[in-house]
A protein has these predicted regions:
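Alpha-helix capping/termination and helix-coil
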Residues: 205, 209, 251-255, 281-293
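Charged substrate- and nucleic-acid-binding regions of tRNA-handling and nucleotidyl-transfer enzymes
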Residues: 306-338
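Structured, contiguous alpha/beta core segments that scaffold functional sites
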Residues: 1-236, 241-242, 246-249, 253, ...
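Short acidic alpha-helical/loop segments enriched in Asp/Glu that coordinate divalent cations
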Residues: 213-216, 255-265, 288-295
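Small/polar glycine-rich anion-binding or flexible loop at a beta-alpha turn
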Residues: 262-265, 297-306, 335-336
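General structural feature for long, well-ordered alpha-helical segments within catalytic domains
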Residues: 193, 197, 201, 243-244, ...
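Divalent metal-cofactor coordination and adjacent catalytic microenvironments
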Residues: 72, 82-90, 277-305, 315
Length: 338
């Protein structure tokens, strides 16, 4: 175990910019965040003690399902946590003995220890916390056993390309949407007159200002184009679509879920999205909370429409066990969260 202070490996500001400015990133991240935050939590007794002692189950249940602190509801609290998880790759929660508070991950440094794994946490380089006050949820990472890596890192190339394509389109139309042109003159023109002609062209010939006004070229002047611009190619439609699909794949959102129209395969993709993207995030958070508080924290999927077939299969399975006398009806109800 190393002893160097572990801060954010990535400059998360670029990911925050992509999240705020790119429609596909904003929509996909919000889908994962909102869907993960709406998965209900069930708190049950478990056969081991947690990091903190002496807290009753009713208190933990209230913190994790209703009011984590006096200032936030559970939905807002969870959404803040999961946004940090996707953007930074880490979640830090401070427990003061009464309430839970979210610490923005990019402000938190981890101080490793060769014997106890973590010596402490520092917030904004000035506020110190001991490991018994912090719940840390880490995203997968190859480079560090302490900090996770942002999910958006793998999509950085696609997001950068998408941004540059959009900027090119914006600049093209901002500059008048005029292809490169050359006016040929049979005689030498002074620099002053050249500038006047350029300004006259920019003022009169602006398609973005309401149309093309005809120009009269006299004195033997000719008009020629230096670039063959295909306006359809400027849409970058196929390239944009390809980049968007790559971003969705990195975030674990099936592209079909954002396509318009009726899709016959939407149901299995919706199910796969919950099983492979949403529930793994929820489980990682729950396992960290379970270790910290010493209570079993499990997701309640009974109200998730995409997972109703799994509930039917589970109900049939437990009914078979009850009918065979292997478990009691009460044990089956508990397993099904009823």
């Amino acid at each position: 175990l190393g002893q160097n202070v572990e801060g954010s490996r990535e400059f998360t500001g670029q990911y925050e910019t992509y999240y705020e400015n790119l429609e596909i990133v904003n929509r996909a991240v919000n889908m994962v965040v909102d869907d993960s935050a709406t998965v209900n939590t069930t708190v049950k007794p478990v056969g081991h003690s947690g990091v903190v002692k002496g807290i009753k189950r009713a208190k933990i249940e209230n913190l994790l399902t209703k009011e984590p602190n006096p200032f936030q509801d559970i939905s807002t609290f969870k959404r803040n946590l999961i946004i940090d998880y996707i953007i930074d790759g880490n979640i830090f929660i401070y427990f003061d003995g009464i309430s839970l508070y979210h610490l923005p991950a990019h402000y938190v440094d981890i101080e490793p220890d060769t014997k106890t794994y973590v010596q402490g946490y520092t917030f904004q380089t000035s506020i110190d916390y001991n490991p018994r006050e912090i719940i840390h949820i880490k995203e997968n990472s190859f480079h560090s056993i302490y900090r996770g890596t942002s999910r958006l890192k793998a999509a950085q190339r696609s997001m950068s390309q998408l941004t540059r394509m959009r900027e090119f389109q914006d600049n093209f139309f901002k500059n008048g949407a005029v292809p490169g042109l050359v006016i040929k003159s049979p005689s030498v023109i002074s620099e002053k007159n050249k500038e006047r002609m350029i300004q006259s062209w920019m003022t009169r010939y602006r398609p973005d200002g309401g149309g093309r006004r005809p120009l009269v070229l006299d004195g033997g002047m000719e008009l020629d184009a230096i670039s063959n611009v295909n306006f359809r190619e400027l849409d970058f439609e196929s390239s944009i679509e390809s980049s968007e699909k790559e971003i969705l794949k990195v975030l674990g959102v099936p592209p079909i879920m954002l396509d318009s129209g009726n899709n016959a395969n939407i149901r299995p993709n919706h199910r796969m999205y919950y099983l492979e993207t949403v529930l793994p995030i929820v489980e990682k958070i729950n396992r960290a909370l379970e270790r910290f508080f010493g209570f079993a924290v499990t997701p309640d999927i009974s109200n998730i429409p995409a997972l109703q077939p799994e509930l039917r299969d589970s109900a049939a399975y437990y009914s078979t066990l009850v009918n065979a006398g292997i478990i009691t009806p009460n044990e089956a109800r508990e397993a099904l969260n009823y």
